[in-house]
C-alpha cells in the first residue's frame, strides 16, 4: 500500500506542478512584474528619501519582505484555485472515492502550492539582484522560514477552497484578510517605528513573524524572537492541517458534494 500511496502522491504533485507551469505566463510572470514595480517605486524612487533602517538601505530592508509576500500570495492562490476548480467540475469526487488517504491528498495539493511559491520566490530573488547585492546571513533560517510559510499558506488556500461555494468566494479571503495582514506585517517598515500600542497589536499578526524571520535570514535583523517565529509557524501549520484533514475526511459525501447534488 505504501507504494500505491507514493504513486498517488507523485501523481497529484505532477498534476499540480504541470498545471501552473503550463500557464507560466499567467502564474509566474505577473508576480515578478508586480514585485519589480515595488522595487522600482518603493526601493529606488521613495527609498532614496527615507534613509537607512537598522543599518541597511531602505531597498535592502524591504527586499526580504517583498520576496515573502510573493511566496505567500502564490502558494495560497495555487491551492485555492486548483482545489476549487476540481471541486466545481466535480473531478474531486473521483479522488475522494479512490483508495487514497486524506493525508496524501492534502500533501499533494500542498506540494503543488509550495512548488509555485518557491518558484516565484526564486524568480523575485533573481530580479532583486538588479537592485541590491546578494547577502545571506543564515541559509538555514532563509530555507526554514520560506518552506514553512509556503506550507502554511498552501494549507490556508486549501481551507478557502473547501469552504468556497463560488469562484467569488476564492477572492474574498485574499482581498479582505490576506492583503491587509501582509501590508501590515512589516514588509515596508520596522515595528520599532510604531508606537507601543501598535507594536503590541502588530504581534497579533502572524505574518509579522514570517517576514521578520525571513528578514533575519537575509540581513541578520528581526523585530521578534526567532523561536517565536518558528513556534507560530509550526502551530498554525498543525492547526490548519488538522482542520483540512477533518473537512476532507468527511467522506464519501462531504459538505461540498452534498451542496453540488442539492443544486
PLM feature segments, named:
Residues 22-48, 62-73, 179, 232-239:
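Hydrophobic alpha-helical transmembrane segments of multi-pass membrane transport/permease proteins
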Residues 33-38, 58-130, 157, 175-176, ...:
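Hydrophobic alpha-helical transmembrane segments of multi-pass membrane transport proteins
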Residues 35, 39-43, 212-263:
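Alpha-helical transmembrane segments of multi-pass membrane transporters/translocases
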Residues 29-33, 166-185:
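Pore- or pathway-lining transmembrane helices of multi-pass membrane proteins that form conduits
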Residues 1-32, 254-257, 261-262:
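Aromatic- and glycine-rich beta-strand/loop motifs that create alpha-glucan
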